[in-house]
């Protein structure tokens, strides 16, 4: 011990004191952290224990509270079920009575339906017979009109063809006569030209023959003189010179005579040219006449073409009218066939819909007008003011359809009323389904129900739902409407 005290009293250095102080701080920090960990663990355990105890207590409270609420809700539901059972029994009794009355009405309606069906079939047979008779009359009238039109067309066609043939023969005769006149005039002009040509030719030949004879005589004289001169030339030169001079003079005379003869020939040629000019003039005149004749011929041919075109147009128009007539007749037959098919379809639909008619409709199929006599007279006066003659004639043919349109309008009104009633019943059904859903949600427990407003959650005797609609208690005298 003394040794220890001695050691303790030994002085420590600064470093050792610093280390010792740091160790103390570390130990203190570790102790503080350990205390914090222990304290947090203690608090967590205590919190978990408290949560467990609170959940257990809450479950116990909910279990006990649910039993109390179920008992209260059970009593309320028993009361509601008793009321609903009473109303259901009353409704069932009413339905039974209605079924019995409907069965009785059904038997009576079947008897009336049989009677009405027999009368309706009889009337339908009469209408069909009337319609067939009308169709036969229409077909006969159509056939008669068609036959008359075909006869008229054939007669008109025959007259047009005869007229055309007559005109063709007439034009051919005119053409042949004009051609014969042209041939005759041409032949006469040729004869005249040939006669003039022969006359001129004969005159020319005569003048040539005369000149030739005259010139031959002159040449013979000259030849004789030349022989004499030649003979004399042989005799003496002087005589030849004198003879040469005389011959020269004679030559001049002969040249003058030749010039005179040439002038005559020129005159003859001028006469020939004049005659040729006359011939040309006659030929031009004949050409003009021929041109006029050709123009007349062309005009006649143009008229012939026009007549042919008119004939073809008339033939095409008649053929077009015939085709149009056949098409219209076929369209009329198809329209009549469609009307007959539509009538048969309407009759079939009437037979099918007859089983849906009520007893009143079978007994009185055509309802009387709901208008007063004054209102009916006012409507008729307004209709008469607005109607035209053609529309009045058309309406007379359809007076038998008034009863049909009455029944059609009645069925249309009943259809609209049933659609309106169906919409009302669907609305009531939706409301009842909503109420039933709310009721089932009130007696069932699920996550969806718990997430919504629920009458089971009651605090201080107050629910989180609004007050439910009070179910009316039916009395024996009240009328019950059937629900769908």
Curated annotation (Swiss-Prot):
Keywords: Cell projection, Cilium, Coiled coil, Cytoplasm, Cytoskeleton, Flagellum. Signal peptide: none annotated. Disulfide bonds: none annotated. The keyword Cytoplasm applies. One of its GO terms (cellular component) is motile cilium. The keyword Coiled coil applies. Its main location: cytoplasm. Residues 92-160, 374-403 form a coiled coil. GO terms for biological process: axonemal dynein complex assembly; cilium-dependent cell motility; regulation of cilium movement. It is found in: Cytoplasm, Cytoskeleton, Flagellum basal body; Cell projection, Cilium, Flagellum; Cytoplasm, Cytoskeleton, Flagellum axoneme. It holds the Pfam family NYD-SP28. InterPro entries: DRC1/2_N (IPR039505), DRC1/DRC2 (IPR039750). Belongs to the DRC2 family. Component of the nexin-dynein regulatory complex (N-DRC), a key regulator of ciliary/flagellar motility which maintains the alignment and integrity of the distal axoneme and regulates microtubule sliding in motile axonemes. Plays a critical role in the assembly of N-DRC and also stabilizes the assembly of multiple inner dynein arms and radial spokes. Coassembles with DRC1 to form a central scaffold needed for assembly of the N-DRC and its attachment to the outer doublet microtubules. Component of the nexin-dynein regulatory complex (N-DRC). Interacts with DRC1. This is Dynein regulatory complex subunit 2. It comes from Macaca fascicularis. The lineage of its organism: Eukaryota, Metazoa, Chordata, Craniata, Vertebrata. The gene is CCDC65.
């Amino acid at each position: 011990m003394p040794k220890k005290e001695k050691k303790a009293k030994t002085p420590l250095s600064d470093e050792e004191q610093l280390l010792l102080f740091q160790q103390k701080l570390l130990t203190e920090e570790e102790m503080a952290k350990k205390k914090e960990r222990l304290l947090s663990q203690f608090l967590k355990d205590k919190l978990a224990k408290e949560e467990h105890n609170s959940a257990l207590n809450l479950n116990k409270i909910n279990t006990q509270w649910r039993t109390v609420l179920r008992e209260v809700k059970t009593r309320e539901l028993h009361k509601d079920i008793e009321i609903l059972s009473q109303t259901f029994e009353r409704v069932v009794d009413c339905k039974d009575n209605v079924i019995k009355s409907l069965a009785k009405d059904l038997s009576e309606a079947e008897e009336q339906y049989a009677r009405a069906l027999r009368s309706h079939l009889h009337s339908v047979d009469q209408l069909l017979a009337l319609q067939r008779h009308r169709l036969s009359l229409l077909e006969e009238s159509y056939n008669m009109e068609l036959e008359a039109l075909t006869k008229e067309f054939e007669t008109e066609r025959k007259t047009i063809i005869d007229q055309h043939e007559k005109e063709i023969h007439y034009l051919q005769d005119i053409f042949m006569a004009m051609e014969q006149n042209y041939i005759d005039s041409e032949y006469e002009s040729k004869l005249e030209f040939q006669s003039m040509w022969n006359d001129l030719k004969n005159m020319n030949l005569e003048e040539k023959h005369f000149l030739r004879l005259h010139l031959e005589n002159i040449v013979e004289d000259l030849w004789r003189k030349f022989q004499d001169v030649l003979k004399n030339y042989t005799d003496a030169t002087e005589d030849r010179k004198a003879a040469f001079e005389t011959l020269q003079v004679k030559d001049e005379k002969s040249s003058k005579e030749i010039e005179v003869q040439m002038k005559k020939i020129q005159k003859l040629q001028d006469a020939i040219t004049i005659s040729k000019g006359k011939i040309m003039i006659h030929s031009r005149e004949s050409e003009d006449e021929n041109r006029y004749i050709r123009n007349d011929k062309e005009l006649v041919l143009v008229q012939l073409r026009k007549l042919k075109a008119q004939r073809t147009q008339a033939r095409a128009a008649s053929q077009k009218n015939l085709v149009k007539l056949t098409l219209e007749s076929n369209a009329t037959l198809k329209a009549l066939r469609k009307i007959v098919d539509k009538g048969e379809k309407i009759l079939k639909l009437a037979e099918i819909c007859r089983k849906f008619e009520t007893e009143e409709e079978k007994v009185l199929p055509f309802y009387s007008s709901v208008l007063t006599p004054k209102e009916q007279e006012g409507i008729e006066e307004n209709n008469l003011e607005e109607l035209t003659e053609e529309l009045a004639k058309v309406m007379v043919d359809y007076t038998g359809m008034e009863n049909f349109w009455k029944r059609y309008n009645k069925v249309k009104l009943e259809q609209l009323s049933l659609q309106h009633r169906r919409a009302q019943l669907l609305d009531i059904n939706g409301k009842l389904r909503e109420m039933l859903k709310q009721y089932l949600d009130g007696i069932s427990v699920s996550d969806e129900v718990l997430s919504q407003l629920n009458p089971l959650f009651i605090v201080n005797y107050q629910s989180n739902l609004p007050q439910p609609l009070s179910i009316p208690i039916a009395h024996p005298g009240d009328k019950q409407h059937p629900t769908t």
